[in-house]
Amino acid sequence: MIILGIDPGLSLTGWGVVEAFSRDKVNPLQYGCIKTMPSVPLIQRLQTINTKLQSVIDKYKPEVASIEELFFFKATKSIAAVGQTRGAIILTASLNKIPLFEYNPKSVKTALTGYGSADKYQMQRIVKTFLRLKEIPKPDDAADALAIAVCHVNTINWNANNNNNASVFLKNKVFKESAKPNLLKKLFSL
């Protein structure tokens, strides 16, 4: 199953594509960031995100996408910008008939480390190790997008007899410790 993870941001939208064969066998296909300049009008920035994300979709043909949920910022302007960016991303996925799953930051951290308070560096190390990458993905938004894709892998009900026929389900947006593998303990101790 090919999964597109997205970390939405108006200036930098991170994306990561992984191919999952099982919970433990996940290969990174590619990752990167879509950058827009603050000096460009909002509509053009959203169009850039749409166009570049469409190119990623056309190239990798993801079966599902996962995106970070909007969480509350202190700055109202940031909330609006990320909300508008998410709208452009959700529309792009919808027009391509790609099911889109949303995860809050704490759920992503819990899925990868076993606890929801992991710091950014711990998350980046887990992504690097789990996906067998030579270095931590840069910029941070790309690493976050890969983490969101790997988080989605943990919500897949893998049929032991036929991994090609994996069915997807969403677990109440909060992962139960017993319902997922703890990648942090499995890979290394931090």
Curated annotation (Swiss-Prot):
For this chain's record, the cofactor binding note is: Binds 2 Mg(2+) ion per subunit.
EC number of the protein: 3.1.21.10
State the GO CC annotations: cytoplasm; Holliday junction resolvase complex
First-listed, main subcellular location of the protein, grouped into a coarse class: cytoplasm
Listed A to Z, the keywords are: Cytoplasm, DNA damage, DNA recombination, DNA repair, DNA-binding, Endonuclease, Hydrolase, Magnesium, Metal-binding, Nuclease
Q: What class of enzyme is it?
A: hydrolase
**PROSITE patterns reported in the protein's UniProt record:** RUVC (PS01321)
UniProt family annotation: Belongs to the RuvC family.
Describe the task this protein carries out.
The RuvA-RuvB-RuvC complex processes Holliday junction (HJ) DNA during genetic recombination and DNA repair. Endonuclease that resolves HJ intermediates. Cleaves cruciform DNA by making single-stranded nicks across the HJ at symmetrical positions within the homologous arms, yielding a 5'-phosphate and a 3'-hydroxyl group; requires a central core of homology in the junction. The consensus cleavage sequence is 5'-(A/T)TT(C/G)-3'. Cleavage occurs on the 3'-side of the TT dinucleotide at the point of strand exchange.
Q: How does it assemble?
A: Homodimer which binds Holliday junction (HJ) DNA. The HJ becomes 2-fold symmetrical on binding to RuvC with unstacked arms; it has a different conformation from HJ DNA in complex with RuvA. In the full resolvosome a probable DNA-RuvA(4)-RuvB(12)-RuvC(2) complex forms which resolves the HJ.
Task: Write the protein's name.
Answer: Crossover junction endodeoxyribonuclease RuvC
Q: What is the lineage of its organism?
A: Bacteria, Pseudomonadati, Elusimicrobiota, Endomicrobiia, Endomicrobiales
